[in-house]
Amino acid sequence: MKYVVKLGGAALENPEIFMACARAVADLVKDGHQVALVHGGGVQLTRTLKQLGKQSEFIAGLRVTDAETRDAALMVLSGRVNKSLVAALGSLGQAAMGLSGGDGLIFRARKKRTVPDLGFVGEIVASDPRWLEAIWKMNAVPVISSIALGFDGEYYNVNADEMAAACAAACRADALVFLTDVPGVRGADGTIMRWLTVDQIPVLSQTEVISGGMLPKLGACREALLNGVKRVRILPAEAAHVLPDLCSARVTDGTEVMAS
């Protein structure tokens, strides 16, 4: 089977959870699956920007990205975070290749048109998964940072959830899994929803049951399902160990998002 796993949030900060996620990915490959690992790094980027004396601003869960912030994102996401994940997989004996979405023209972006303007924030408009296929043939894991190249030659910061959905659609993944720092999607009563359909997402958004970073995440879930991805699940990163059992056993952690 073909998996796209998105890792972000505090999972990248906690050494134990970080390694548990890497181990789960390595176990999937050991079991014969093809895995692409897409990552964010918003916490690390915010910290670096603060060290540079720059405040972070978010609108509807998306980071406002001027040229300086974009350059910092290139450094942090495609550099420090990406190579840390490659190293973690390598320490487990699993070969990995670190990439940005712009490498090999795997993903092409255009500036996201929003009001107010978000700056160098992009959305994926084209993809070419041949590099991913080549890496999989070597029994390795492509590790992809959420940076993509525009047709104008500029790099764009892409929401990592949206990047993961685009990756899953491009390679026709059997499953897209978001490993995150929340236990799942909370309903109006505050309890974790074990499943929801794409038709429920606009309603939950309009009633403000979901907000902040969960908005683009659920939007990404919807796009993935509408573009042929078979399964989408939001899973707490501390439950990453269930990944190898996701399609062969009953898993109750997190929230399953379904097409209908």
Swiss-Prot record:
Amino-acid positions noted as binding substrate in the UniProt annotation, renumbered to this chain: 41-42, 63, 157
Alphabetically list the UniProt keywords. Amino-acid biosynthesis, Arginine biosynthesis, ATP-binding, Cytoplasm, Kinase, Nucleotide-binding, Transferase
Q: Which residues form the signal peptide?
A: none
Location(s), subcellular: Cytoplasm
Q: Where is this site: Transition state stabilizer?
A: 6, 217
The main place the protein resides is: cytoplasm
| GO BP term (any one) | arginine biosynthetic process via ornithine
Q: Does the keyword Mitochondrion apply?
A: no
Q: Does the record carry Hydrolase as a key word?
A: no
What functional role does this protein have? Catalyzes the ATP-dependent phosphorylation of N-acetyl-L-glutamate.
Q: In which pathway does it act?
A: Amino-acid biosynthesis; L-arginine biosynthesis; N(2)-acetyl-L-ornithine from L-glutamate: step 2/4
Question: Per the UniProt entry, what species is this protein from, by scientific name?
Answer: Acidobacterium capsulatum (strain ATCC 51196 / DSM 11244 / BCRC 80197 / JCM 7670 / NBRC 15755 / NCIMB 13165 / 161)
CDD domains (alphabetical): AAK_NAGK-like (cd04238)
Regarding protein family, the annotation reads: Belongs to the acetylglutamate kinase family. ArgB subfamily.
Read off the PANTHER family from this record: N-ACETYLGLUTAMATE SYNTHASE, N-ACETYLGLUTAMATE SYNTHASE, MITOCHONDRIAL
Taxonomy of the source species = Bacteria, Pseudomonadati, Acidobacteriota, Terriglobia, Terriglobales
Q: What name is this protein filed under?
A: Acetylglutamate kinase
What reactions does this protein catalyze? N-acetyl-L-glutamate + ATP = N-acetyl-L-glutamyl 5-phosphate + ADP
Q: Which GO terms describe its cellular component?
A: cytoplasm
Q: What is its EC number?
A: 2.7.2.8
Q: Which GO terms describe its molecular function?
A: acetylglutamate kinase activity; ATP binding
